[in-house]
Amino acid sequence: MKTLLLTLVVVTIVCLDLGYTTKCYVTPDVKSETCPDGENICYTKSWCEVFCTSRGKRIDLGRAATCPKVKPGVDIKCCSTDNCNPFTPWKRH
């Protein structure tokens, strides 16, 4: 009986989501934040604007419930593990 009870407790703990939430980097501060319930996708969105050749692409880091749809000319990468959307600033020469 004790073995059955212990097995049930272990299965319950493994199957339950014990309040775990994903963390994503978010702009403009580029700091890691805990995602609210239902938002488990981190993304990095990038695109060119007027000053793209001299300043590089614009970058937007965030979180969402699903990977956002983007317009042509906008690149997006989505992921679902903690802090999987880091931003590495490019070096100016």
From Swiss-Prot:
Pfam family, one: Toxin_cobra-type
Entry similarity comment: Belongs to the three-finger toxin family. Long-chain subfamily. Type II alpha-neurotoxin sub-subfamily.
Domain of life (superkingdom): Eukaryota
Gene Ontology molecular function terms on file: acetylcholine receptor inhibitor activity; ion channel regulator activity; toxin activity
Keyword Transmembrane: no
Organism: Ophiophagus hannah (King cobra)
Known tissue expression: Expressed by the venom gland.
Cited Gene3D superfamilies: CD59
Major localization class: secreted
InterPro entries listed in its UniProt record: Snake_3FTx, Snake_toxin-like_sf, Toxin_cobra-type
Signal peptide: 1-21
GO cellular component assignments: extracellular region
Disulfide bonds: C24-C42, C48-C52, C67-C78, C79-C84
Subcellular location: Secreted
Function: Binds with high affinity to muscular (alpha-1/CHRNA1) and neuronal (alpha-7/CHRNA7) nicotinic acetylcholine receptor (nAChR) and inhibits acetylcholine from binding to the receptor, thereby impairing neuromuscular and neuronal transmission.
Native organism taxonomy: Eukaryota, Metazoa, Chordata, Craniata, Vertebrata
Protein's recorded name: Long neurotoxin LNTX22
Keywords on record: Acetylcholine receptor inhibiting toxin, Disulfide bond, Ion channel impairing toxin, Neurotoxin, Postsynaptic neurotoxin, Secreted, Signal, Toxin
